[in-house]
Amino acid sequence: MKCEKKGNLVNRQVTVGQEDLEQINRLTRREFSQEELYCFRVVLCDNDVDRQMERFDEETLEQLARMFVGKTGICDHQPKTANQLARIYQAQVEYFPGKTNLLGEPYCAVVAKAYMVRTESNRDLILEIEAGIKKEVSVGCSIRESRCS
């Protein structure tokens, strides 16, 4: 069974601190400076009921958060080299006080920090992210079994 969950960018840009830079540079072949990078936060998946009437529980979200680190974000679900746009360098489950899911439970989501190297070829993409035009992501995954909750 395959499932897809949608998420959204939760802010325009992340201020790259020393800890962020260290995490990013663990994933790169050379060290990058703050000025060379564009970083942003994005909601990857959550505990809300989706259009297939499925949801992730909190334990699964915690497991997914660990698995997303180091994964590359691609464009249009096409795993080609040219479509690799960003890499996730940190992910964790976050709670949003006062917000509940469709079941009335406290809402939580896997929120990731991702980075891109600033280049001429992605300048327009960064502007579209900052303008809120490019704001949604889709996460694909496979599961071994399906259980009713």
Residue ranges, per PLM feature:
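Signature of dsDNA virion morphogenesis modules
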Residues: 1-149
